Structures are given as C-alpha cells and as structure tokens.
C-alpha cells in the first residue's frame, strides 16, 4: 500500500504528493487520510487527475475540515467499494456504504463491490415489452412505463417530481413486491427522512435499500452516490437474478455536482457553464442502468429542469437515454391539476399497438388528438369566446376539459396534505373510462365532477353528491 502526503487543500479538492518512488495510485482509486493520531477519524478521497511529478488531484467524499498539509495519505489500491446483497435491505447509508440509520454498522466481512464498473456487454442486454402498471391514469394511458425500461420525470422547481416519485414507490414497490433501491442525489434531507419513515410504516423498507448523498454534502459525494445506488441494484440483478426497481432523485444534481467538481479540477467549462465531460458522465451512468439476460433494472429518475428550460444541456443530455418521459407542466399546477403531467409533451416507446394493444393505443391517440385540438382552439376562445365555435367544436371542448380534469387524481402519499384518500386505477379501468368519455357518455355530467378522482365510478358518485 503506497503512501503520500497532502500538498494542498482547496475546499473539497486535495492534492497529494507521492515522493521517493512511491507507486502512483490509479484514476478512481480510493485514498484514506486520518485526521487524528489514533486513526478514528478518516476521510476518503477519490483520485481524479494525475498532475505529474508524483502529484495527484483528488476529490473528497466528506468535509475536508481539519485536514492539514503533510498528513499521511494511504492508497487502498482499489475504487470505493460498498456493501451489496441482502444485508443492504432495510438499511440507509451514504456514498461510502457507511450506515446512517443508527442501526449496527455492516460487518467487516460483508460482500462489497467497487462503484466503478463497465456497462454490460451488448450480447448480455435484453429488452422487454411488458407494461409496468403504475395506477396513475395519465401515465398508464398516455406514456406507459416498460418493465426493465428507463423513465425520466422532468419538471421545474415545485411542480411535483418528488411527490410523483414517492407515489410511484408507494404504488409499484408495494404491488411489485420485488427489491427496490432508492438513491437520493443532492436533494433535501427532510424529504429523504419523510420517505424513510413512510416506508418503515408501510413495511416496504424491508425490501428496499436507501442511499443518500444530500444537498449539504460535498460535490464528490453527490457526484458518486448515484453510482453507489446503481452498484447495489446491479448486484441484485446480476448475482441474484432479481427484477429491481431503481429510483433516483435527482439526476440533475448528479450533473450539477459534476459541474462543481469539473470547475474545481480546473477544466474549461462548456455550454452554459457545464462540464465538458457532461455527455460522457451521463452516458457512463445511464449505460449501466439496463436490463440483462440475468435480471432487469427498471429505473425511474426525477430530472430537474432549470428555469423550465428543456433545452438546457443537463435535461437535454438525459433525454437521449430514456424509454419514457413524463413531463410536468407549471401551467397545470396553476389550474390545480395534479399530477401536473403534460399529456401532449410526455411520451413513451411503449405506446404502440404491439405492446399496449389496439384498443389502448386508439383511445390514447384519440385523447391526445382531442387535447391538441382544444389547445389550438384556446386562442379563439380567449379572444372571441365560446359562441364563435361550431357545435362540433363546442362538444369537443367540453370533452377535452372533462378529459383534462379526469387525468388528475389524488395520491396516497399526499393524503396527509389534501385530506383526500389516494386512488390506484388499474390500466383496464383507465382505458375503459376514457373510451366512454370520448364516446360522449358523460357529456351531461358537470366538469367539476371529473377533478381529482379515481375511476369513472368516482365521477358518477361525485356528480350525485353535487345534485346531478
């Protein structure tokens, strides 16, 4: 094990010099430095650059407070390794695989895997055409998720990405019954804490591993924590042959941390100040999130859209890797429609007759056509009013508004805020309900009865309570 000494510390960046013929550590190797003489307080560094003359530049995974020049640094000879396997289920830990849930730490001989790996070879990959039912009408109808696919939840600040991902955890993890890995990347600690206790109460935690590198942590930890969660998911997929659900909140923070690290390493910034290696870093992460002939990984990733600008390089780079996109729209939140999923901007590779079936496909495309026509007519309505529309257009607008409201529903995870019980709607009920609305079966029912309900039976009940 070669050793060096700290040459300089600049925030989370630490330069280490290996003199007297000591072997230089490889890129991505983990180095350990002890802050105190009795070796109880250690900090892990990851090698990022080799500067020449025996000097390497590293990124700290924890705060560098207390580090001084001249402290001894040891090369572990391998990348950061984290615990994997059944021991991780029901536990919460950080980027280094250290437990942060006040329970006993992992045993020293626990199985560990390095967080840096190659993506599966082309001939190992497998594709699936099986739909993953979410119980959320707008998703199941218009942008269905594939089992073993990659899903992105796009949205600006405060439009409901985290609530949607929590509802998906509630619906899918409980229905699916398999193993889930939740990775919190650069998000609020409070949200992670709430999610942990909620999972504990529902019993889902027993089949879930949780990894957190939150907002208050150094950029190195936020950049690498996604790989820690992914490594755990890969082990369940490859070694145990499981179908795994991988939730990541938020991929943008992974990019943001990479940008901070890049600037600290002295790289020239690229478009909008992002790191020049943005596409490479995103590709290295996303190519590992895949399904193989041993097992599947279905990933659901929240992706923050800065200033609601979808052309920003961070969300634009992530777009290319996804099977389904669920776009959250601020205008819909202003109308009180939750989840605020844009039915026209969201898309899915799975929405084809071969995968969802002919009836589902026809209903979904007709819903999109009606909503698109309504959007085109909105300018005329705003300027001239409804009276200028033809009778057919008036009927279409009425149905479009009913569809728009019916795409909303109450969430189980939001019950404590709304006071309304959440609803889980099977795909078959969703398709049947929208088909009947399109046929004009419910044109006589007031629009308000369609707002925030489950299946169409709830609409009829609500209308009855309103006196219709």
Swiss-Prot record:
GO cellular component: plasma membrane; proton-transporting ATP synthase complex
UniProt entry tagged with the keyword Ribonucleoprotein: no
Sorted UniProt keywords: ATP synthesis, ATP-binding, Cell membrane, CF(1), Hydrogen ion transport, Ion transport, Membrane, Nucleotide-binding, Translocase, Transport
UniProt-recorded name of the protein: ATP synthase subunit beta
Localization: Cell membrane
Catalyzed chemical reaction(s): ATP + H2O + 4 H(+)(in) = ADP + phosphate + 5 H(+)(out)
Record function comment: Produces ATP from ADP in the presence of a proton gradient across the membrane. The catalytic sites are hosted primarily by the beta subunits.
Main location: membrane
Annotated SMART domains: AAA
Species for this entry: Streptococcus uberis (strain ATCC BAA-854 / 0140J)
EC annotation from Swiss-Prot or TrEMBL: 7.1.2.2
Coiled-coil boundaries: none
Similarity remark: Belongs to the ATPase alpha/beta chains family.
Membrane topology summary: Peripheral membrane protein
InterPro entries in the record: AAA+_ATPase (IPR003593), ATP-synt_VA_C (IPR055190), ATP_synth_F1_bsu (IPR005722), ATPase_a/bsu_AS (IPR020003), ATPase_alpha/beta_chains (IPR050053), ATPase_F1/V1/A1_a/bsu_N (IPR004100), ATPase_F1/V1/A1_a/bsu_N_sf (IPR036121), ATPase_F1/V1/A1_a/bsu_nucl-bd (IPR000194)
Record note on quaternary structure: F-type ATPases have 2 components, CF(1) - the catalytic core - and CF(0) - the membrane proton channel. CF(1) has five subunits: alpha(3), beta(3), gamma(1), delta(1), epsilon(1). CF(0) has three main subunits: a(1), b(2) and c(9-12). The alpha and beta chains form an alternating ring which encloses part of the gamma chain. CF(1) is attached to CF(0) by a central stalk formed by the gamma and epsilon chains, while a peripheral stalk is formed by the delta and b chains.
Chain sites annotated for binding ATP: 155-162
Lineage, opening ranks: Bacteria, Bacillati, Bacillota, Bacilli, Lactobacillales
GO molecular function terms noted in the UniProt entry: ATP binding; ATP hydrolysis activity; proton-transporting ATP synthase activity, rotational mechanism
Superkingdom classification of source: Bacteria
Entry-linked Pfam families: ATP-synt_ab, ATP-synt_ab_N, ATP-synt_VA_C
